[in-house]
Amino acid sequence: MKLKEVTEGKVRIFVPDPKEYMIEGKFDPSWAPVFYNPKMTFNRDLSVIVVSLLKPKIILDALSATGIRGIRYYVESWKSEQLILNDKNSTAASLIQINVKNNGIENAKIYNKDANALLYEIKSEYIDIDPFGSPVPFILSSVNATIRNGIVAFTATDLSPLEGSSRTSCRRKYDAINYKLSSSKELGLRILIGKIIREAATLEKTVHPLFSFYADYYYRLFVIVESGARKADENINKNLKYFGECPRCGFQTFVDENCKTKCPICGENFIIIGPLYIGPLHNMEFLKRMIDTYSDFNYLSSFNRIQKLLNVIEKEAKYKSVFYNISKLASKLKVSAIPPIDSILECLGDASKTHFAPTGIRTDKGYEEIIRCVKSLR
């Protein structure tokens, strides 16, 4: 395997040379014997900031590939007492050894095992699950492997089922009814969290989001794990519901059950999806710490993008409602000229943009107030 050295953050690692695995002038990371995707640098950059605040004694990257994620945590975030890197691909495990040595890390433990098998053998304060596709096969094992109110970080790249395009796949993987709705970019994340909560409950544990976001073609989610059947029951009863959207007028709201419910505005039957999580997507105290800290990482290649994302999330996080997609709402209302988002925000007064969609707004003001602004500004 021919290797190429690349720099990401403050580390230098060897990866399979893309030139050796191109097909008709194109390259996909999955074609190489060991997976490395430079497009996920933004994901890893933000994760470096998160781990720097958590300072876990034990870090476990269960699906390490080249080892880039765990190595960056150790070099840039926090020199943990123990760094555990694993990949079931023997070629990847060998490459991890090279990259660990290349970055002067002496206390790393490298495994060549199935991720689930390893997670049932050892415990960790911070576990990273960054698979190719869905994280569902690793939810139970990773939640079970946490200690001391540990953290599990999940990446999900299978947006088709989560956003309602592949309804059968969503039912199979996430045990949720789903449709493509106006706010599906956010609802997909909520379906993912809901699935994790239900899986954790079977272990008499529960999870709460610490920080989460959507970017490019994936969701990234950090959850804190708590033990106790009562806590699991309380979280399910309080934060797992369904979501309804009116296909005629665009009104949307959380609903208690998956049953025929009529829109209170126009009387049309709701399209209902779920179950899904209805609580906050971020821990506000932790979010504030991220905002206070991220400037220390101005060397990151995606620093400006991180700054922009955190600024938007800081503003939208205070609102409890799912965002409204103004473009799709205007289409349902047959408003041909969509008003500028900034003008709608000014009209509403108490509202913000959302990082989920460029034409989305988040506010706890009522549907009628939003419609008034949209129509008055056209």
Swiss-Prot record:
Keywords, ordered alphabetically: Metal-binding, Methyltransferase, RNA-binding, S-adenosyl-L-methionine, Transferase, tRNA processing, tRNA-binding, Zinc
**Amino acids binding S-adenosyl-L-methionine:** R44, R69, D87, D114, A115
Which molecular function terms from Gene Ontology are attached? tRNA (guanine(26)-N2)-dimethyltransferase activity; tRNA binding
User: What's its top-level EC category?
Assistant: transferase
**Record's InterPro entries?**
SAM-dependent_MTases_sf, Trm1, TRM1_arc_bac, tRNA_met_Trm1_C
**Annotated catalysed reactions:** guanosine(26) in tRNA + 2 S-adenosyl-L-methionine = N(2)-dimethylguanosine(26) in tRNA + 2 S-adenosyl-L-homocysteine + 2 H(+)
Provide a GO biological process annotation. Answer: tRNA N2-guanine methylation
EC number(s) recorded for this UniProt protein: 2.1.1.216
Q: Indicate which residues the UniProt annotation says bind Zn(2+).
A: C246, C249, C263, C266
Domain (Trm1 methyltransferase): residue spans on this chain: 4-374
The record's listing under Pfam families reads: TRM
Superkingdom of the source?
Answer: Archaea
Q: Which family does the entry's similarity section mention?
A: Belongs to the class I-like SAM-binding methyltransferase superfamily. Trm1 family.
Q: What does this protein do?
A: Dimethylates a single guanine residue at position 26 of a number of tRNAs using S-adenosyl-L-methionine as donor of the methyl groups.
Protein name in the entry: tRNA (guanine(26)-N(2))-dimethyltransferase
